[in-house]
C-alpha cells in the first residue's frame, strides 16, 4: 500500500488483505521501499552510459529512449552476427516473482538466448527429488490453508529470520504444534514446541526412523497409500530396520523424541517445510526423497493445512486455486540448453563464447 502526501510517496506498507503475507513487508523490502528508494539522492534515476574503461567510473547520463534503443541494437547485432545463444541471461532469487522473474525469462527465451540456471549451484537437488516423488516441487501447499495445520514440521529452515510473514502467521498465531529439525538451535528452534537437534548429515536416518514409528504404531494412511503411493511395499523392509534406537545411534536424538515427533506429525493435518539448507549437503536429493516419505505415508498432502513447502512458486500455485492468477510459465524447449552457473567463470574467460552477459 502506497501512502502519498501532496502527490509524493512518503511510505510503503504491506497489504493486510494479501492472502499470503497478511500485511508485513519482509525486512529487505521495508528498508528499501521506505529508505533509499524514497531518497532520490541515494539511487539512480536515469540510465548511465560508460564512457571510459571498465573500472574507471566514467559515465554520462543518457535518456531512457537512448538506452533502450542502444541495448536493443546491440542484442540484435549479437544475435545476427554470432547467434542469440551467445547472449547469456542470469537471474536469482531477487527476481523470482511473477513479473520480475517470468517476464525477463519470456523475453530472453524469445530472443533465443542461453539461460544460466541458478539452481545448478543451489536448489536443484531439492527440486529434482520432489519432482521424482510428487511430480512437482513448488505447488505442494496452499498458504491460505495454514490456519488448518495441526502440526508444522520445519526441517532445515529458520523462518524467524528468513520468512517473517510465515513465521508470524503460521508458527506463532495459529496454534499449530511446531517441530523444528536442525543441528543449530536457531531462534525458530528455540521457540518451537519440539526441537530435534540431530547430528549434521543424518537427516535421512531420522526420516526413516520416524517412518518406522508411523508404520509400527498403525499411523499409515492405508487408503491414501493404496490410492496414491507407488513402491510402498518395496520400502517396508528398510523402514522396519530403522528403529528409533537405530535412529538414535545415527542422529543422536533419543528414541522418545523421535517417537513424539513422528506421532505429532502423523496426527495432522501437518505441513512439512523443507528448507534450502537441508539439500545443500552430500546426497541432498536423496535426503529430500527420504523426508518426502512422511506426507506420502500419512496422507498429509492435498488437503487444507497439509502438504509440503519448498520454495513455493506463486504463479504455479495460482493454477491450483492459490494466491495469484494462473500464469503460463515461459517455455524454452526449442532454444539452447541452459548452462550451469558453476560453468560461468570459465565461460566468461572466452570472449567468443559469451558476447553478452545480463
Region spans (language model):
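N-terminal export/assembly segments and adjacent metallocofactor-ligating motifs
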Residues: 1-219, 227, 235, 246, ...
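Generic recognition of flexible, low-complexity loop/linker segments
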Residues: 75-77, 139-143, 258-262, 305, ...
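Intrinsically disordered or highly flexible coil/loop and linker segments, enriched in small
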Residues: 80-84, 219-220, 241-248, 267-271, ...
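Conserved short loop/turn motifs at secondary-structure junctions
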Residues: 88-96, 250-253, 275-282, 314
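Non-catalytic, well-ordered alpha-helical scaffold segments
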Residues: 105, 204-208, 233, 259, ...
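Conserved, charged catalytic cores of large soluble enzymes
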Residues: 233-240
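Non-catalytic, charge-rich alpha-helical accessory subdomains
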Residues: 253-271
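A glycine-rich, hydrophobic/aromatic-adjacent loop/helix-cap motif
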Residues: 265-358
